[in-house]
Amino acid sequence: MASKNREIIKLKSSESSDMYWTVKNKRKTTGRLELKKYDRKLRRHVIFKEAR
């Protein structure tokens, strides 16, 4: 049977309490994820970091 390579992670805004949920491949992306996404509370793009 195949092992689970994908993990559900939470992306938390660096400037507010807004969050996104996404899936990442544990084999290909070993470090923590950082993405620039739209913050709905601040109404602008900010950096979202992986939180566990």
Curated annotation (Swiss-Prot):
Transmembrane segments: none annotated. GO terms for molecular function: structural constituent of ribosome. GO terms for biological process: translation. Keywords: Ribonucleoprotein, Ribosomal protein. Pfam families: Ribosomal_L33 (PF00471). InterPro entries: Ribosomal_bL33, Ribosomal_bL33_CS, Ribosomal_bL33_sf, Ribosomal_zn-bd. The keyword Ribonucleoprotein applies. Belongs to the bacterial ribosomal protein bL33 family. This is Large ribosomal subunit protein bL33. It comes from Chlamydia pneumoniae (Chlamydophila pneumoniae).
